[in-house]
A protein has these predicted regions:
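A cross-kingdom marker of C-terminal helix-rich interaction/assembly modules
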Residues: 1-69, 74-244
């Protein structure tokens, strides 16, 4: 899968919508990893829509789009982190109660800190590009030299974009779009491979429980053995009530 333009970013958004439609077809028959995937897809899709809206006018590339690259990187890190753990149910419990994942450990006993996840992500895809994207995208969250470089100058009362780091504005803007595209590409890759395997394992577990408990419906099995999203709803609503 290769993305090059905003149109390709639109295509990735459409692929995410296809993923979401598959989950809608399942109704309430969700597994713990499904709850996380749906949350990530909804957030990623909204970020893509906002980024496209803010960057489609080549004459007025809105700098408000820049922090969205870091937010999408956040989606990628959360998605990938969840494929590295032994107990996804426990991680989901951490997720719905709003606790930080940093202290949660993966299968090898390493804490899920961002620096570690970036390194693992680079190993997975055989490139250091995500380390570079993460560092640069983080600069967009706060006022930094990135914003100073793209500040506007006035010429006869009309705003004029300055050149950036010896590149013209259009080249710089294309670089930003490329970063967002690469993040989307990696996210979709993980959803299509790692999460496909996770869902397969979940279905195998469900199949085993069906044989062991033939009198129970699928939803009763999922609720009883902690595979359904109802458990997470209960925890989440309890958390919301505690904040009132």
């Amino acid at each position: 899968m290769s993305f090059k333009t905003i149109d390709d970013l639109r295509n990735s958004r459409n692929i995410m919508m296809e993923f979401l439609s598959q989950y809608r077809d399942l109704g309430e028959l969700w597994f713990p990893n499904d709850v996380l995937v749906i949350s990530i897809l909804n957030r990623a899709n909204s970020i893509n829509e906002a980024f496209i809206e803010l960057t489609t006018d080549s004459d007025d590339y809105n700098v408000a789009a820049f922090p969205l690259i870091r937010l999408q990187m956040d989606n990628l890190l959360y998605c990938y982190a969840s494929t590295l753990v032994d107990d996804l149910m426990e991680l989901m419990g951490c997720f719905v109660t709003g606790n930080n994942w940093n202290n949660f450990k993966d299968k090898d006993g390493n804490e899920l800190k961002e620096s570690y996840l970036i390194r693992k992500l680079c190993e997975k895809f055989g490139t250091t590009v995500f380390e570079k994207i993460y560092k640069r995208a983080s600069d967009y969250i706060h006022l930094s030299t990135e914003y100073i470089g793209i500040s506007l100058s006035k010429n006869g009362g009309e705003p004029v974009k300055t050149t950036i780091e010896n590149y013209d504005a259009s080249t710089y803007q294309q670089g930003l779009t490329d970063m967002m595209i690469l993040i989307n590409q990696a996210l979709l890759n993980i959803l299509a491979t790692d999460y496909s395997c996770l869902r397969h394992e979940s279905h195998k577990a469900l199949q085993k429980l069906r044989l062991e408990h033939p009198t129970l419906s699928d939803m009763e099995i999922l609720d009883r053995f902690g595979y359904s999203n109802n458990r997470f709803r209960a925890v989440f609503h309890k958390r919301l009530r505690s904040k009132e």
